[in-house]
Structure formats: structure tokens, C-alpha cells
UniProtKB/Swiss-Prot annotation:
Keywords: 4Fe-4S, Cell membrane, Iron, Iron-sulfur, Membrane, Metal-binding, NAD, Quinone, Translocase, Transport
Gene behind the chain: nuoB
Cofactor binding note of this UniProt entry: Binds 1 [4Fe-4S] cluster.
EC number annotated for this UniProt entry: 7.1.1.-
Name by which UniProt lists this protein: NADH-quinone oxidoreductase subunit B
A Gene Ontology BP annotation from the UniProt entry: aerobic respiration
């Protein structure tokens, strides 16, 4: 006999972290950072065929101060990188970043000095979405994966500890250029 059998109907048992995670995951407001062809697929996701509003993303935010998810869609040039970082810094906590497309994830086919070889060199990335360009269905799937991640994110001191551990693990990772085995 557990506690669940002793409670009357209509009682829900949970933790504050689980309830806060549920609320946060169902009210994401994305700030779009469309830089190339991936932005067209991102705009298609907001249309009636894919209906991103059913996942709590009623509108795309035009200002970073009202957004908590940044979708970086397309290649990021070296000149655009400081602007991307400034927009990320203006977003309120908690905030998440989704790198949409192979150009945002790893520089794509643009292996030259003018393109950032992965947006994770500028801002911390939570979800990487492959493809050139990825289909709207893939973006919806990535957002649902991000919902799962947000649901499990701890609060308060536990959140700060989890973020510090993730940053430390990211600093220990090999640079992207070494992992891809690029020609030099």
C-alpha cells in the first residue's frame, strides 16, 4: 500500500521542479536568428500546416528580452558573431539555444576564415539540428527534445551546479575542427 492508494481522487503529487519544468516547457517564446536558407524552413514551421502554436510557441519574439529560446538558423559570419552573443546576453534566464542546420552546428560547407565553425563557439547550444536545410518536421522534433530537456532541468542552486558541470564538460571537449578531420 502506497500513498497513492490512500489519497482521494483529484490529488496530484509532484515536486516544485517538475511543475516549474512543465510550465516552462509549454511556454517557450523563440527569438529567431535566421541567417540563411534554414530560416525559410523555420518560417514554414510557424505556418498552419505544422502549427507550432500547439506546443506553446504562439509567437516568435522580435525582441530578445521577451524570448527564452534562440533558434540560430544558418551560417554565422565572424562579423555577425558579436551580434549573436549580444542578443543571447540580452535574453532573460532561463534561456536555451537551438542550432538549426549544419551551418549553424559546424560551419557546414563553408570551411573558411569568414564563417564561424559552429555557433557553439559563440553561445552555449542545447540542441543541434542536422540537415541542409532541415525540414520543419525535424525542427518540431528538436523542439520536443528540448521540451524533455527543459522538463528535467533543476531549479535554483541545483540548476547553477548543472550549468557549471555542463560548461566544464564543454571545455574538456575536443575542438570541432579536430573532430571533423578537415583538410588543411
Amino acid at each position: 500500500m502506497g500513498l497513492e492508494e490512500q489519497l482521494p481522487g483529484g490529488i496530484l503529487l509532484s515536486t516544485v521542479e517538475k511543475v516549474a519544468g512543465y510550465v516552462r516547457k509549454n511556454s517557450l517564446w523563440p527569438a529567431t536568428f535566421g541567417l540563411a536558407c534554414c530560416a525559410i524552413e523555420m518560417m514554414a514551421t510557424a505556418g498552419p500546416r505544422f502549427d507550432i502554436a500547439r506546443f506553446g510557441m504562439e509567437r516568435f519574439s522580435a525582441t530578445p528580452r521577451q524570448a527564452d529560446l534562440m533558434i540560430v538558423a544558418g551560417r554565422v559570419s565572424q562579423k555577425m558573431a558579436p551580434v549573436l552573443r549580444q542578443i543571447y546576453d540580452q535574453m532573460a534566464e532561463p534561456k536555451w539555444v537551438l542550432a538549426m542546420g549544419v551551418c549553424a552546428s559546424s560551419g557546414g560547407m563553408f570551411n573558411n576564415y569568414a564563417i564561424v565553425q559552429g555557433v557553439d563557439h559563440v553561445v552555449p547550444v542545447d540542441i543541434y539540428l542536422p540537415g541542409c536545410p532541415p525540414r520543419p518536421e525535424m525542427l518540431l522534433h528538436a523542439i520536443l527534445k528540448l521540451h524533455e530537456k527543459i522538463q528535467e532541468m533543476p531549479l535554483g542552486v541545483n540548476r547553477e551546479r548543472a550549468i557549471a558541470e555542463a560548461e566544464e564538460a564543454a571545455m574538456l571537449a575536443r575542438p570541432t575542427i579536430e573532430m571533423r578531420g578537415l583538410l588543411r
